[in-house]
Amino acid sequence: MTRPLVGVLALQGDVREHLAALNDSGADAVGIRRPEELEKIDGLVIPGGESTTMSKLLQIFELLEPLKARLRDGLPAYGSCAGMILLASEILDTRPDAQHLGAIDMTVRRNAFGRQVDSFESDLEFEGIVGDPMRAVFIRAPWVERVGDDVQILARVPESGGAAAGRIVAVRQGSVVATSFHPEVTGDRRVHELFVDIVRGV
């Protein structure tokens, strides 16, 4: 599999930016809006956006159950920000009727970093990614409060991060990766390259 076909859930969020990042990272990228399109892809990116709205859209577009089934069957997935929330097994501070995918054994606190005006940037050390620290952009972002035994912690907010210091902001469980930040907006392709490598290896 030289250039895997990776879908980007095209309901909300930075869809174009993720498509460009995946194409730059060695994948052929395509937007996903219909259940039948899930059958053709080798991996899926779930972009940022508003997680409760995205969960409603997944149901409206009849994608929720087919996507859960594909994830259970081992479809590699990467979620950023709201995508991380949707991939979690437990979500704090969300609507009681919000649906999620449960692909990573973790508890996520929605909007943990505060409102849009509280958005910030930080340099992170990211497990499995070499080179300079990764510049991470957090926009009304979640953080991870608990991970299961099979979940690998990839990045935390550094000690210089104030009240958020030490918070978990990137994880991996098997072939599923999630970050609370938005690598698609910085031009740093290393998270997308890591994910494309995971897709190739499955």
Swiss-Prot record:
Transmembrane regions listed in the UniProt entry: none
Binding-site residues for L-glutamine, renumbered to this chain: 49-51, 110, 139-140
Domain of life per record: Bacteria
Key word Repeat present: no
One cellular component term from this protein's GO annotations in UniProt: glutaminase complex
Keywords: Glutamine amidotransferase, Hydrolase, Lyase, Pyridoxal phosphate
Associated pathway: Cofactor biosynthesis; pyridoxal 5'-phosphate biosynthesis
MF-aspect GO terms: glutaminase activity; pyridoxal 5'-phosphate synthase (glutamine hydrolysing) activity
This protein's record includes keyword rRNA-binding: no
Active-site residues, record numbering mapped to chain: 81, 182, 184
Catalysed reactions, semicolon-separated: aldehydo-D-ribose 5-phosphate + D-glyceraldehyde 3-phosphate + L-glutamine = pyridoxal 5'-phosphate + L-glutamate + phosphate + 3 H2O + H(+); L-glutamine + H2O = L-glutamate + NH4(+)
EC number(s) given by UniProt: 4.3.3.6, 3.5.1.2
Gene Ontology annotations of biological process type: glutamine catabolic process; pyridoxal phosphate biosynthetic process; pyridoxine metabolic process
Family: Belongs to the glutaminase PdxT/SNO family.
HAMAP family linked: PdxT
Chain's role: Catalyzes the hydrolysis of glutamine to glutamate and ammonia as part of the biosynthesis of pyridoxal 5'-phosphate. The resulting ammonia molecule is channeled to the active site of PdxS.
Subunit structure: In the presence of PdxS, forms a dodecamer of heterodimers. Only shows activity in the heterodimer.
Protein name: Pyridoxal 5'-phosphate synthase subunit PdxT
Species this chain originates from: Rhodococcus opacus (strain B4)
Originating gene: pdxT
